Every structure is written in structure tokens, then in C-alpha cells.
From Swiss-Prot:
The protein, known as: Hyaluronidase
Record-level GO cellular component terms: cytoplasmic vesicle; extracellular region
Stored InterPro entries: Aldolase_TIM (IPR013785), Glycoside_hydrolase_SF (IPR017853), Hyaluronidase (IPR018155)
Record text on subunit structure and interactions: Monomer.
Residues with attached carbohydrate: 67, 103, 111, 153, 357, 401
Annotated ranges, domain EGF-like: 427-438
One GO BP: carbohydrate metabolic process
Organism: Crotalus adamanteus (Eastern diamondback rattlesnake)
Tissue specificity statement from the Swiss-Prot or TrEMBL entry: Expressed by the venom gland.
Disulfide linkage: 47-340, 211-227, 365-376, 370-427, 429-438
Function, in words: Snake venom endo-hyaluronidase that degrades hyaluronan to smaller oligosaccharide fragments. In venom, it is not toxic by itself, but increases the diffusion of other venom proteins by degrading the extracellular matrix. In addition, it displays antiedematogenic activity.
Localization per record: Secreted
């Protein structure tokens, strides 16, 4: 019945609604028929093991590591001291590994990184998210402002010590050149090593790409959320990084000042828009999968996101065509039994139900619009169309008790629902498929997979 609807409507939609926008093919999803995934990347093992509080993550379609641990087969995150000899200064002013990349042995770093990857990800068949979290310095000289200016000063002194005969201007030029060369080598070679050792993983750096659209505090009434032109240019200059990444991990953390505001959506939307742009320019064969990092609680607080801000984060991410979203959390989540219960109550309530809503809606749209061979993406990225279950057609039912739950989605897609999807969304076909509804095999692309 539903396929007949598509056949009957296809010609009309093509002539009247299809806006001719080309969408680059996507890599097939990590799990079959799961176009939008939600990951849990928080150290909440103690909730279950120590406090006997089961967070019910899998019940609500949330992908998690064994025992809800921070790192494992689903997602592994490498902090500065967990991977090789990352040169940096930590938040307490402690020096590590020569401080600046040009003052540390890359070979020694890579050798240690190899051991660390084998320790943290023992299986070569790992196909989860591999996230490198190096935030202390940025590989571009001009982006090391504020507290990161210390890396420029250290680099200048390093060049001065090695070349005292040079003028001050020559020293500064040399310092910038040597810093950016070494920073690029550290980041690029570490990434390539990880991909060589665990080739099925989704590898990238946390907070890349960034957008620097944080000016919502200074002039909230004039805030547009747009990425400054200079930051877009700087992101273009990082093409070497995007080409060697196999996934992108921007962040869309919301502060309380953005709570339930239009600015929250603007902030998230433009960060995602820039990430999707980078994802499409990184490769020629398919767009990189994008997995933005979000928090279930407002940044630096233990206050849960409002339902409106769940839409502004999870909902916006799915509608923009991302492959998924990662919820990061701190040790506070599992610090006490009360903390665990607070997290559990939020998951059992608004958070879990909304995740089920969006993941199911994304799957339904992929099934009926893209024949399971693609994911649904907004036709117009700035529209307010979301991948939500239609409330008149579907219900989310939660059965069970405090120790065991089961979530069931009941309902069926009606004709008017399908028309809404066709009018507002288009298919981003997975590799090996093409056509308006991803209904045609693409032999050339199949050979590349």
C-alpha cells in the first residue's frame, strides 16, 4: 500500500516539490536500518554495579558500552593522557611531553599510541566511534588565542633558543611555521595510525569542526548563530584533517543562558550546518558521518534539558541528516545513588521517550521515503521540519516495572504523514544506491565499498 503511494506521488513530487538540491551519498549506517543512532558516552558504570540503578539505556534505543562504561566497543574516547605522548599544559598548569608539538618526538608518541590503542581497543574488528579529545591547543596558529596563547609564546621562545641569530620577525615567522607543521603531523599521523590499526572504526577529533559562534552572551538580541566568515575560512584550511577523518565530532553543548530559547536552536543549527558542509567536502565518494556531542544536562550543571531543548539538539541533529548524536556526561552522573536516580528518572521520562520518538521517526522515513537505502534530510536546511512521530498516528507505550521495561511504538503511517515527509525531506542515499528515493543500484559506487 505504502509503495503504491510513493509510485503515485513520485511524478507529482518531482515536478512540484523537488528542489533539485544535490545531496552527496552517505556511508551506510553503523547498524543496518538504523539511520540515526544515539550514543551514551558517560562513566555511569557505578550506577549499575555499585548502586544497583539500571539506567535502562538500551530500552530507550540508546547505544552504550558494556556496563555503561565510558569507553568500549560502541564508543571509545581518548583523553590527553590516554593516547601517546600528547604535548600540552593541563588546566592546573602542569607540563606534559615538551609542552609544544615541535618539542616532542613524534616517533616516540606514535609508538606509545600504538600500545594505548591496543590496550583500550583490543579487537581489530572494532567498528564503534573512536574519538580523540585533544583540546589544549589547536593546529592553526591563529586559533590559539586566550589561554592557548601560551603555545604561541612557547613556540617563539623555542625558535629563539635554536636560532638566536635571527631577527624577531624572522623568529615569529619560523615559530608559526614549525608549530603548524608539528601540530599537523601529530594530529594527522595519530589519526592515520588509529585507522590503520582499527580500520572499521569511525575516527575523528572531538570539537572538530568548530564554528566559534559563542557570542550569544554578549549581544543575545542580535545573535544569529552564524559561524564567522573567518572561521569558515579557517575550517577550509583544515582540509588535510577532514580528508583523513572518517567521522566528525562537533559539539552542541547548551549553557543555561540558552535554555528554551530561539538562540539555542540558532546555536545548534549553524554548528551542524558547518559540520555538514565540511562532511561533504572532505571526500569525493561520500559525505563523512557526523556525530555531534551533546549533554543531557545543561553545561556545567546537573539541570536536565527541557523538552524544547531536546528538540533543539537531538531533533535538529536528526533533521539535518547527521548519522547520530553522542551524549557525553561527567563522573557526577554516577557519584551517588541520588545522582544515578536523577539520571535514570530523566532517561525514563522526557529524554528516553524523545529519543525513541526521533530514532523511530528517522527509521520510518528511511523505510517509506528512501526504501531503507538512505536517510531523510531536510530539503531546506533552515526549515522547521523535524523527524517526529505523528501524534495522531503513533503512540509510545512503556511497559514493565522499575527493574524491567519495554518500549513499544504503535501506529501506522497515514497518507497525509507521507505527504508531509515528501514535501519536507529528501533522501541522502547510502553508497551503492541512487535515485530520488534511493531505489536504484549504483554499480560504480558498490565497487568502491
Amino acid at each position: 500500500m505504502y509503495h503504491l503511494w510513493i509510485k503515485c506521488l513520485a511524478a507529482w513530487i518531482f515536478l512540484k516539490r523537488f528542489n533539485g538540491v544535490h545531496v552527496m551519498q552517505a556511508k551506510a549506517p553503523m547498524y543496518p536500518n538504523e539511520p540515526f543512532l544515539v550514543f551514551w558516552n558517560a562513566p555511569t558504570t557505578q550506577c549499575r554495579l555499585r548502586y544497583k540503578v539500571d539506567l535502562d539505556l538500551n530500552t530507550f534505543h540508546i547505544v552504550t558500552n558494556a556496563n555503561d562504561s565510558l569507553s568500549g566497543s560502541a564508543v571509545t574516547i581518548f583523553y590527553p593522557t590516554h593516547l601517546g605522548f600528547y604535548p600540552h599544559i593541563d588546566g592546573r598548569g602542569h607540563f606534559f611531553n615538551g609542552i609544544i608539538p615541535q618539542n616532542e618526538s613524534l616517533a616516540k608518541h606514535l609508538n606509545k599510541s600504538k600500545s594505548d590503542i591496543n590496550r583500550m581497543i583490543p579487537l581489530r574488528t572494532f567498528h564503534g566511534l573512536g574519538v580523540i579529545d585533544w583540546e589544549n591547543w589547536r593546529p592553526q596558529w591563529d586559533r590559539n588565542w586566550g589561554s592557548k596563547n601560551v603555545y604561541r609564546n612557547r613556540s617563539i621562545q623555542f625558535a629563539r633558543d635554536l636560532h638566536p641569530e635571527l631577527s624577531e620577525d624572522e623568529i615569529k615567522r619560523l615559530a608559526k611555521q614549525e608549530y603548524e607543521k608539528a601540530a599537523k603531523s601529530f594530529m594527522r599521523d595519530t589519526l592515520l595510525l588509529a585507522e590503520e590499526m582499527r580500520p572499521y572504526g569511525y575516527w575523528g577529533y572531538y570539537l572538530y569542526p568548530d564554528c566559534q559562534n559563542y557570542n550569544y552572551k554578549t549581544k543575545p538580541d542580535q545573535y544569529t548563530g552564524e559561524c564567522p566568515d573567518i572561521e569558515i575560512t579557517r575550517n577550509n584550511q583544515l582540509l588535510w584533517l577532514w580528508r583523513d577523518s572518517t567521522a566528525l565530532f562537533p559539539n552542541i553543548y547548551l549553557e543555561t543562558v540558552l535554555r528554551s530559547s530561539d538562540n539555542a536552536l540558532k546555536f545548534v543549527h549553524h554548528r551542524l550546518k558547518e559540520s555538514m558542509r565540511i562532511a561533504s567536502m572532505a571526500r569525493k565518494d561520500y559525505a563523512l558521518p557526523v556525530f555531534p556531542y551533546a549533554r543531557p544536562f545543561y553545561a556545567y550543571t546537573f539541570e536536565p534539558l527541557t523538552e524544547e531543548d531536546l528538540v533543539n539538539t537531538v531533533g535538529e541533529t536528526a533533521a539535518m541528516g547527521a548519522a547520530g548524536i553522542v551524549f557525553w556526561g561527567s563522573m557526577q552522573y554516577a557519584s551517588t545513588v541520588d545522582s544515578c536516580r536523577k539520571v535514570k528518572d530523566y532517561i525514563d521520562g522526557p529524554l528516553g521517550r524523545y529519543i525513541v520518538n526521533v530514532t523511530t521517526a528517522a527509521k520510518i522515513c528511511s523505510h517509506f521515503l528512501c526504501k531503507k537505502h538512505g536517510r531523510c534530510v531536510r530539503k531546506h536546511s533552515d526549515s522547521n521540519a523535524f523527524l517526529h512521530l505523528f501524534p495522531d498516528s503513533f503512540r509510545i507505550l512503556v511497559h514493565g516495572n522499575a527493574t524491567e521495561k519495554k518500549v513499544i511504538v504503535k501506529g501506522k503511517l497515514e497518507l497525509e504523514n507521507l505527504i508531509f515527509l515528501i514535501n519536507n525531506f529528501m533522501c541522502q542515499c547510502y553508497q551503492g544506491w541512487k535515485g530520488l528515493y534511493c531505489e536504484k543500484h549504483s554499480i560504480k559506487d558498490i565497487r568502491k565499498i
